[in-house]
From Swiss-Prot:
InterPro entries for this protein: Ribosomal_Su5_D2-typ_SF (IPR020568), Ribosomal_uS9 (IPR000754), Ribosomal_uS9_bac/plastid (IPR023035), Ribosomal_uS9_CS (IPR020574), Ribsml_uS5_D2-typ_fold_subgr (IPR014721)
UniProt-recorded Gene Ontology molecular function terms: RNA binding; structural constituent of ribosome
GO cellular component, one term: cytosolic small ribosomal subunit
Keyword Ribosomal protein: yes
Gene3D superfamilies in the record: 3.30.230.10
PANTHER family: RIBOSOMAL PROTEIN S9, SMALL RIBOSOMAL SUBUNIT PROTEIN US9M
Name of encoding gene: rpsI
Family per similarity comment: Belongs to the universal ribosomal protein uS9 family.
GO biological process, one term: translation
Keywords of this entry: Ribonucleoprotein, Ribosomal protein
Keyword Ribosomal protein assigned: yes
The protein, known as: Small ribosomal subunit protein uS9
Length: 130
């Protein structure tokens, strides 16, 4: 805990989110912008709010997020992971409910590397019989 802020780091794909929460009225600021301005897709907004809605803390915290790297989906997942960790830092009894929902576990799926002789990671060059 830093002052009256609770902190959590979240990661997803190549995105990293640093999340700070404190008691407030439910404002979420991502990289200096309101969340609805930063995330264009409704699904991204939904992903970010999931741990708050699960624990019934959607209107009780002001959240400040600094997120870098990745795309919109990766950043939304990283913010969700960071909010989950910050909530656990605030109240450890929330961990069981968040863990059961699958928000505590880091999603370890990463982009598979491109192989030599292939077009992409698994797409081979077209086979010619003759």
């Amino acid at each position: 805990m830093i002052g009256n802020w609770n902190y959590g780091t979240g990661r997803r794909k190549s995105a990293v989110a640093r999340v700070f929460i404190k008691s407030g009225k439910g404002d979420i600021i991502v990289n200096g912008k309101p969340i609805k301005e930063y995330f264009a897709r409704e699904t991204s907004l939904m992903i970010v709010r999931q741990p708050l809605e699960l624990t019934a803390h959607a209107e009780t915290f002001d959240i400040k997020v600094n997120v870098t790297g990745g795309g919109e989906t990766g950043q939304a997942g990283a913010v969700r992971h960071g909010i989950t960790r910050a909530l656990i830092d605030y109240d450890a009894t929330l961990k069981s409910a968040l863990s059961k929902a699958g928000y505590v576990t880091r999603d370890a799926r990463e982009v598979e590397r491109k192989k030599v002789g292939f077009h992409k990671a698994r797409r081979r060059k077209q086979f010619s019989k003759r």
